[in-house]
UniProtKB/Swiss-Prot annotation:
The gene is trpC. InterPro entries: Aldolase_TIM (IPR013785), Indole-3-glycerol_P_synth (IPR045186), Indole-3-glycerol_P_synth_dom (IPR013798), Indole-3-GlycerolPSynthase_CS (IPR001468), RibuloseP-bd_barrel (IPR011060). Belongs to the TrpC family. Keywords: Amino-acid biosynthesis, Aromatic amino acid biosynthesis, Decarboxylase, Lyase, Tryptophan biosynthesis. Pathway: Amino-acid biosynthesis; L-tryptophan biosynthesis; L-tryptophan from chorismate: step 4/5. The keyword Lyase applies. Its EC number is 4.1.1.48. This is Indole-3-glycerol phosphate synthase. It catalyses: 1-(2-carboxyphenylamino)-1-deoxy-D-ribulose 5-phosphate + H(+) = (1S,2R)-1-C-(indol-3-yl)glycerol 3-phosphate + CO2 + H2O.
């Protein structure tokens, strides 16, 4: 595990401990469970939105709303989650990914609520999930999907977090980087498999990472390639390899109009 990932996980543990003091788990769980059928807050179907785009012959883009990153600093000074979400929806995104980590990515729970409230797209809570508390938290904030990072979790906890999310009606995107992590990910139930092209130890990016892992991924998995999609040629390279789902953040966040950049990249 990289030093930066260890630091992030230590901060997450402290955040969860503090959150539990502000609100107990039974109360949070009760609210999360009550939202299964509440108008406007019920899960929107993250996996279904991706598959519908692909079935229609389009790239399924998970468009990210991210103000900053540990490696690149602030990506977008004029940061209005509602406007960004609306722009993405208008220009063909399938889903949203919203950073909620405050310490390292300058994200916030409120950004998720505001972005999801501004458009009809399903939303992923993009964060480092290490505790059941965060899963219930995600649902009360309106998340339709959570991210599980294999490099950050042992299998027992990962399976527990997945089961909780599925029970609440959310989808789960499990993220891997290498062969060893892929083996663990394939033991989960979720069909959504994200391949991060960024090495979490060196922060170097290579699209070859997705292509190298593809032969080892069962056909029933929906592969999402993450990081490093910067040009139409990158999109073509992936789609030629039968990868049709993409999670893109930085390229959009640095553009004057994120949705227009989405349309340019995937048009």
């Amino acid at each position: 595990m990289s030093d930066i990932l260890q630091k992030i996980l230590a901060v997450k543990a402290d955040e969860v401990a503090a959150a539990r003091k502000r609100r107990d788990l039974p109360s949070l769980r009760a609210e999360a469970e009550s939202l299964r059928s509440e108008a406007g807050l019920a899960p929107r179907g993250f996996e279904r939105a991706l598959r519908d785009k692909i079935a229609a012959g389009h790239a399924a883009v998970i468009a990210e709303i991210k103000k900053a990153s540990p490696s690149k600093g602030v990506l977008r000074e004029q940061f209005l989650p509602e406007a960004i979400a609306e722009s993405y929806a208008t220009h063909g995104a399938a889903c949203l990914s919203v950073l909620t980590d405050e310490h390292f990515f300058q994200g916030h729970a409120d950004y998720l609520k505001r972005a999801r409230g501004a458009c009809p797209l399903p939303a992923l809570r993009k964060d480092f999930m290490v505790d059941l508390y965060q899963v219930y938290e995600a649902r009360t904030w309106g998340a339709d999907c959570i991210l599980l990072i294999v490099a950050a979790l042992d299998h027992g906890l990962m399976a527990e977090l997945e089961a909780c999310a599925l029970e609440l009606g959310m989808d789960v995107l499990v993220e891997v980087h290498g062969d060893d992590e892929l083996e663990a990910a394939l033991r989960l139930k979720t069909p959504l498999l994200g391949v991060n092209n960024r090495n979490l130890r060196t922060f170097e990016v290579s699209l070859d990472n997705t292509l190298d892992l593809l032969p080892h991924i069962p056909a029933d998995k929906l592969v999402v390639t993450e990081s490093g999609i910067l040009a139409p040629a990158d999109v073509k390279r992936m789609r030629d390899a039968n990868v049709h789902a993409f999670l893109v953040g930085e390229a959009f966040m640095r553009a004057k109009e994120p949705g227009v950049e989405l349309a340019r990249l995937f048009g």
